[in-house]
């Protein structure tokens, strides 16, 4: 449970266009858990590595990071460049005594450190879609440099298929809320109200994109802090799977499987006609991108691996027989 002060850099602005005036909401994400990842790999029939060291990039309030560090023997490192986030995460680590080292550094600062070990598991949830192209490249270079052979990467990111129709309204929402130091909870609420009035006016945009109103009605009730971090950063770039795959290939990573177990059962997502079409596509990259379009998927949760190894039938059977389960219920 160590806090490491940041090193000096030549950055002209530490925010890089990211919302920092409002702290992010708290939340827990099981996909960031290496133990969960190992089970998902088993479900996909893939070999997973022994994970001794793990790292989370852009951990927010650090709830998932702290739970995973406190609940295992894995050594954890993590960074979030908003000082209030790092301080809150450090308080949690101090309380639990977790084997965890916390930084409040930017991706440029953290990813270029020379004193970090090689990691078996590296994760980032959401932030890929909210950061600049330069910061995305810092992450890719970090994966290339610091992920062990056989290591696993988790990436959660906004998908273009589900967000394309919302892009124009997001731009108006961002402009109405202001930018830089002017963003506040009140400004976010005012911007939401303005867009609500806008959507009451008949327009060709809504005629062609009827689902936009339904989705906007849903997000109106969201915490302004969530809306600010989700939609109001300078950079907001939903991407196709094919684009992410190209980035990952720079770090010698290949797609392993979805972190969402329901996607391991295609018949729950696709009808026969859809499945037949998908089965004609040889390219994994194109197939996943087309699947996202069919589902109008807004968010992907993916595992990537440096050295993909499929388990034999004997290995798979042996591992399933050795797998332990705990059944829980709500009272």
Model-inferred region functions:
Residues 21-52:
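Conserved alpha-helix/loop element of class I SAM-dependent methyltransferases that forms part
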Residues 137-149:
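A short glycine-rich, Lys/Arg-flanked "PGG" loop and its adjoining helix->strand segment in the class I
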